[in-house]
């Protein structure tokens, strides 16, 4: 027994010694491990430094990343919109108390429409899909043409923008913003009646194309140049429609930022439609640069120039304003006359900046020229920046020249003030309840007879637009090649995912079933809404 106890005791001692030895070795082992890890990291860093990717590889990787993101974003949105169309159909059928067999027919018809739309998306649109009638607008980055679609002989306005100029002037975000809001304004309930409808957008190697609704009445600027001023009744109507149009844009969570008579189009019935969303931005985003960057070169001290070169008489101001108006409209810089000071100053701003622009337009309609107009952009810029000092004098001069009602003067002054106290800050109802709009039926405004109704001789009548000469023969189309024939570079990245195709428009042009016939005696637009979708990224369509 003693031997056994001694062996047990010895075994226990050896075990304790081994444990102590293990404990003493562990720190050393840890140091070795750390050294090993440090060595491995250094070796990895050295290997990493040796990896150099070419510019072409990096561009291809970025293009692939953007393409995949755009594809799946568009795919999931497409599936959601398809579900929305089905849900909308089911809801409408319930409201109409259709029998089950009738519902089955409508479901099959919608399924057929969806199939036709999917097939039509495979058809590539190009500039050759349209016949050019004439130019109806020209700007710094492109032109607008009245065109006829060869497939169905329908007329559209085609906006064609030069990619290289857009990139050179850093305008790619702006053109994408315009495309996005025009697409967003279409939904299962129909297109927004206050916004010019977008039917297709596509591109080739050199140009971007927006195929939009043709609005034959021209723009408000043309009418103001023609009539000089409007009566208060006419002004009341057009300002009321502009208020509702902007409210519909704000409800989409966008700010227009560039509301001016040039961008207020008049449709064939005389009602307003808003266009040109190049400076439009989201209510909660700063992705579009402030206009202060555009006018930066005109900045100086905050004092008004002691010698203002603006003509003092009203007739002289008329002549001066008309003389420079069109030139400014088509220049790279444009005019700051309608822009809110907080936008120019790069201060924080929201939807209220659009209400400032409405006040400027209202003043112009009643007086004949914008309140801050000057002989130079610099003078205009400084007058806006110092509006608290300049506006009182401007209003006094206007009252001496024009018989402004107290209600009109009050509304203008409540538009042209600080954002926090500007009318509309507390909601559009604040504007609608102003005494100037007494008697306006806001709910039936688009059913009210407008002051000016365009007199049109034909669907191709462009008499309400300026005349433009063809500068040169239209450039031949340069199709966007497939990836196997043409490498995508950084030049293409800003335009990936630009393609858009309206659901109803594609079916009308390329489908075999007429949307009105498909729903029998029920008008599809009235009963089921105008249905739209975005086109996903399809190979080289980008």
From Swiss-Prot:
Taking every annotated instance into account, which residue ranges of this chain make up the domain Protein kinase? Answer: 130-437
Q: Where is the composition biased (Acidic residues)?
A: 19-51
Cystine pairs: none
Q: Is Transmembrane a UniProt keyword of this protein?
A: no
The EC code for this enzyme is: 2.7.11.1
Q: Which domain of life is it from?
A: Eukaryota
What is this protein identified as?
A: Probable serine/threonine-protein kinase ndrB
Its encoding gene is what? ndrB
């Amino acid at each position: 027994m003693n031997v056994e106890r001694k062996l047990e005791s010895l075994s226990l001692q050896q075990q304790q010694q081994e444990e102590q030895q293990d404990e003493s070795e562990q720190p050393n082992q840890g140091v070795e491990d750390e050294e090993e890890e440090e060595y491995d990291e250094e070796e990895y860093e050295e290997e990493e430094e040796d990896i150099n990717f070419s510019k072409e590889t990096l561009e291809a990787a970025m293009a692939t990343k953007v393409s995949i993101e755009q594809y799946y974003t568009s795919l999931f949105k497409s599936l959601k919109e398809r579900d929305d169309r089905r849900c909308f159909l089911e809801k409408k059928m319930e409201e109409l108390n259709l029998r089950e067999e009738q519902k089955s027919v409508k479901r099959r018809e919608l399924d057929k429409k969806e199939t036709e739309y999917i097939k039509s998306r495979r058809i590539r649109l190009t500039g050759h899909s349209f016949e050019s009638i004439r130019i109806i607008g020209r700007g710094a980055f492109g032109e607008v043409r009245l065109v006829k679609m060869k497939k169905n002989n329908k007329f559209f306005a085609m906006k064609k923008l030069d990619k290289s100029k857009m990139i050179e002037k850093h305008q790619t975000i702006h053109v994408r913003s315009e495309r996005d809001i025009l697409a967003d304004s279409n939904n299962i309930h129909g297109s927004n009646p206050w916004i010019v409808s977008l039917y297709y957008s596509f591109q080739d190697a050199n140009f971007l194309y927006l195929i939009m609704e043709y609005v034959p009445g021209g723009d408000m600027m043309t009418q103001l140049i023609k009539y000089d001023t409007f009566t208060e009744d006419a002004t009341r109507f057009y300002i009321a429609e502009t208020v509702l149009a902007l409210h519909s844009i704000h409800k989409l969570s966008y700010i227009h930022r560039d509301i001016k008579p040039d961008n207020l189009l008049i449709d064939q019935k005389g009602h307003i439609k808003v266009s040109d969303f190049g400076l439009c931005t989201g209510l909660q985003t700063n992705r579009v640069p402030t206009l202060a960057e555009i006018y930066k070169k005109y900045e100086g001290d905050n004092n008004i120039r002691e010698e203002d070169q603006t003509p003092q008489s009203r007739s002289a101001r008329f002549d001066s304003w008309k003389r420079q108006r069109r030139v400014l409209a088509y220049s790279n810089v444009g005019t700051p006359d309608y822009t809110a000071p907080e936008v120019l100053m790069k201060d924080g701003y929201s939807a209220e900046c659009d209400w400032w622009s409405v006040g400027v337009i209202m003043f112009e309609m009643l007086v004949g020229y914008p309140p801050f107009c000057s002989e130079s952009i610099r003078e205009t810029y400084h007058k806006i920046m110092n509006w608290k000092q300049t506006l009182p004098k401007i209003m006094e001069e206007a009252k001496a020249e024009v018989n402004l009602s107290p209600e009109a003067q009050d509304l203008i002054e409540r538009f042209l003030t600080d954002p926090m106290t500007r009318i509309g800050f507390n909601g559009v109802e604040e504007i609608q309840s102003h005494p100037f709009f007494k008697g306006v039926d806001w709910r039936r405004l688009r059913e009210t007879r407008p002051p000016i109704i365009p007199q049109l001789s034909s669907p191709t009548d462009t008499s309400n637009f300026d005349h433009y000469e063809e500068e040169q023969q239209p450039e031949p189309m340069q199709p966007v090649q497939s990836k196997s024939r043409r490498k995508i570079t950084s030049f293409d990245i800003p335009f990936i995912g630009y393609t858009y195709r309206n659901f109803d428009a594609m079916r009308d042009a390329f489908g075999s079933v007429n949307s009105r016939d498909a729903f029998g005696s029920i008008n599809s637009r009235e009963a089921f809404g105008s249905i739209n979708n975005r086109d996903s990224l399809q190979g080289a369509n980008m």
